[in-house]
Amino acid sequence: MSTRGIRAQLLQTDDEWETRNAVLSRHLADLVDEYSASGATDGIEIGCQVGALTEQMGRLTRVPTWTGIDPALTEKIVSDGGCTLHPGRASRLDFPDETFDVALFANVFEHVPPDERDVSLREIYRVLKPGGVVIGQLPNPYFPIESHSRLPFMGWLPTKWQHRYWKLAPVSWGHDFYVVTIKDLKRTAQRAGFDVAHVRNFNYPPEVIPNGVRWAARLLERPMRYMPWSWQFVFVRPA
């Protein structure tokens, strides 16, 4: 098989990617409804891209109003689903204190530069109401197939070697993540004042995995209970 063929096997089809997004949305929405206050009205997604997950939170959760911020946005826009999306970074949230009941922080922390991690969690804490919650997900950098590059053992390498190895990645984007674990995130959240309410291992079902390597996911099913693809978490700003 050619190198191009091998790379193609590591990428999800449109249907597999759509299934992945649906699974992620459903699991995060369940956490929002379980841990947010019964009268919660306002949510914000940190790192919303173009608002696909933001919109899903409005559809799937009891929280009716959602907004989002993303550094790639150049101006304020309204998504097709009616969510207002703003340019911005987690380290500088342009909202008043105690604005939101829920902050969604899914697959974002690993992209935050080290010198912005503490201030980012402090900013999220600031814009949450007392009793507000952070719901999110963090990919495991030590999972055998690293999620950003789709390459084996990328997260185990020193950063300099990661950039060299990235040239073999089948993806169209560049290297843009840091190796951080749930322990790093929990410590950062606790320094900001959050209580850790819940952490769980999370793995996507086989139908999300590219069909060409789905057999490997089935073989790894048992080890993945201990070495998960990612962690999902809930942090609470004390009331």
Predicted regions and their residues:
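Conserved N-terminal segment of class I S-adenosyl-L-methionine
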Residues: 1-96, 102-106, 121, 229
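Short N-terminal helix/helix-N-cap motif within the alpha/beta-hydrolase-1
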Residues: 51, 113-117, 146
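Short aromatic-enriched loop/helix-cap "lid" or pocket-rim segments at secondary-structure transitions
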Residues: 79-81, 145-150, 208-212
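Short catalytic micro-motifs in class I SAM-dependent methyltransferases
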Residues: 107-111
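A short glycine-rich, Lys/Arg-flanked "PGG" loop and its adjoining helix->strand segment in the class I
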Residues: 118-133
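Conserved class I S-adenosyl-L-methionine
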Residues: 134-160
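Acceptor-substrate binding/catalytic loop of class I
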Residues: 169-183
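A C-terminal cap/extension of S-adenosyl-L-methionine-dependent methyltransferases
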Residues: 182-190, 194-239
